[in-house]
Amino acid sequence: MVGLAELHSRPVLGLGPNWRQFALLVAINAFVGGMVGMERSVLPLLAKDEFGIASSTAAVSFVASFGLAKAIANLYAGNLSERFGRRSVLIAGWLFAVPVPFILIFAPSWGWVIGANLLLGVNQGFAWSMTVNMKIDLVGPSRRGLALGLNEAAGYLSVAVAAYLAGVIAQSHGLRPEPFYLGIAFAAVGLALSVCFARDTSGHMRVEAGPHAAATPLRRAFAEATWRRPRLVSLTQAGFVNNLNDGLAWGIFPLFFAASGLSIERIGLLAASYPLVWGGLQLVTGWTSDIFGRTPLIVAGMLIQGIALAIAGVGDSFGTWLIALGLLGLGTAMVYPTLLASIGDLVRPTDRATTLGVYRFWRDGGAMAGALLGGAVADLFGFKLAIELVAALTAGSGVAVLVIALMKPGRTGQEVTV
């Protein structure tokens, strides 16, 4: 029989009982997003203007290094959190962030910038993964889409604000060092909040899972999400392609806009508009998927992203590109939290962190692939063809999700027994 003291101390699931920790994790993830945002409008231009890098492929190599490090960190973050606790991995992620702005400020060569982005990738893989898992742990299965919508909204609204501020600062003061002072502040506050106030949520996960549930080994979770379970595989490939076009938007779009004659401030505004729409609308799209199901939002979102990229590729004015990036943000908002919630629907609570780590490994590997593919095609055939190629791949990914969902029917949007 459970004693009164044990019953009293047992974690309770739900947004209401856990709103303080939930709100804290929203704030922490905003600072995680800010670390990436400070780079989005500045670093591609820094490669060309300060380090004299002419090749588009070389100029976007920082995105590739970031994507590689983040993908690997994602893969192991869930497994490490099962062994050492969510909070410990969150704090470790912030420790990797601390040197990044200083390296970017003082980097004597482009190799140092690539190294800084390896550290930033680990920061994002550990810290962002843990804010995702900790929020899911706290709220339980019924509010999963809402929780992830709030998490991703906070992160990507912060990306937008930081990208815009960095662009404005760079326009007024230069590409270095002033824009990267933002990163020093973000890392200091994010680390302090995580160390002083964040609490581990592994106990909440165990309440949902039950007392005798055992986690699936990483090797098996990797196989299931990569080739064994068609529904999981369809979600994994959609995440990969979604970030393929994000890698293109991060690495290639600033170069494309600069080659078209836009000022740094306008490039910063465009770089901010995409994550601004993406982040803001996730407040609605995650909750919507809880009610109407995941698949319709994923398929429609991927198709809208493909259309947006096609418009960006043929556009030749600031107004057209602003509309295209707004549409890209809309499509991404429909997809991003919904894919995460769908993974959570299809696996047991004890497997969730590990399987989400595998999914995020492939998803963020897409950013690396998008930067390298976009850079290589841009070097050979020009920016516009690179953008149109990724547009076609994105639309095709949405069709693939629809086909597999029709072949393997079953509504996602609620817990599935596996």
Regions found by a protein language model. Give the residues of each.
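Juxtamembrane intracellular "pre-TM" segments in multi-pass secondary transporters
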Residues: 2-19, 200-235, 418
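Helix-loop boundary and gating motifs at the non-cytosolic
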Residues: 16-67, 233-234, 238, 242-260
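Residue-level signature of mid-helix packing/kink "hotspots" within the transmembrane helices
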Residues: 67-75, 160, 275-283, 367-368
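Helix-to-loop junctions at the C-terminal end of transmembrane segments
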Residues: 73-85, 170, 281-293, 378-379
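Structural signature of the two symmetry-related core transmembrane helices
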Residues: 88-102, 296-311
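Cytoplasmic helix-loop-helix junction between adjacent transmembrane helices
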Residues: 116-156, 341-342
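Symmetry-related core transmembrane helices of the 12-TM Major Facilitator Superfamily/SLC fold
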Residues: 178-195, 387-403
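Helix-loop junctions on the cytosolic side of multi-pass membrane transporters
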Residues: 194-209, 403-415
